[in-house]
Amino acid sequence: MSEREYFVEMDVRSVEAYELAKEWFDEVVFTKKLILDTEPDWDSLKEELRELRRTYGKVAVLLVTRKPSLIRTFKARNLKALLYVQGGDMRVNRMAIEAKVDALISPWLGRKDYGFDHTLAGMAGRRGVAIGFSLSPLLRANPYERALTLRFMAKVWELVRKYRVPRFITSSAESKWEVRGPRDLMSLGINIGMEIPEARASLNFHPRSLLSRL
């Protein structure tokens, strides 16, 4: 299969979403979502991730936290999974990039601005921290929120392009109803200002580079 035909879905968060995404994508990453402000039981988490790797192969952990220091704690552990951080809180956004996690997902989420600036973009580019552009929050938003989010995503994309930040476009689906195929995800990229080759690379080149870390 050629580079042009190969697509990767980097973030699906349920069994049913994974099974549907596998029909449309060549590789799919199963994401274990953790909402935490204290450290987990590490032995239990490692065992759960071991089982997920046996079942799904490629696995990520999505850390949702209000405690920036927890990001460094997770980064220091050898979890044998990609480490994503849910963006939104500016302190969390900054710490995710400083700690060199694999990806910061939707740094604008829940904000009245886009949660990302030239300083963070430059740091992300140097440290190889990808920005995840997620579709699912748009599906849950009202028309005003959707328009605002698209504007924020376009602003972040300008910085990602300028500073050569790794990135990917993903459904971030928590149910099968939120899964979308490569064509729809590419359309999202084009809608926020990507050229077609840039949107394609956000489903191919950049995801595959991240997967090489596993």
From Swiss-Prot:
Any idea which UniProt keywords this protein has? Cytoplasm, Endonuclease, Hydrolase, Nuclease, tRNA processing
This entry's Enzyme Commission designation comes to 3.1.26.5
* Gene Ontology annotations for the cellular component aspect, listed alphabetically: cytoplasm; ribonuclease P complex
Reaction(s) catalysed by this chain, per the record, are:
Endonucleolytic cleavage of RNA, removing 5'-extranucleotides from tRNA precursor
Q: Which GO terms describe its biological process?
A: tRNA 5'-leader removal
Q: How does it assemble?
A: Consists of a catalytic RNA component and at least 4-5 protein subunits.
Q: What family is this protein classified in?
A: Belongs to the eukaryotic/archaeal RNase P protein component 3 family.
What is the protein's given name? Ribonuclease P protein component 3
Organism, as annotated: Thermococcus gammatolerans (strain DSM 15229 / JCM 11827 / EJ3)
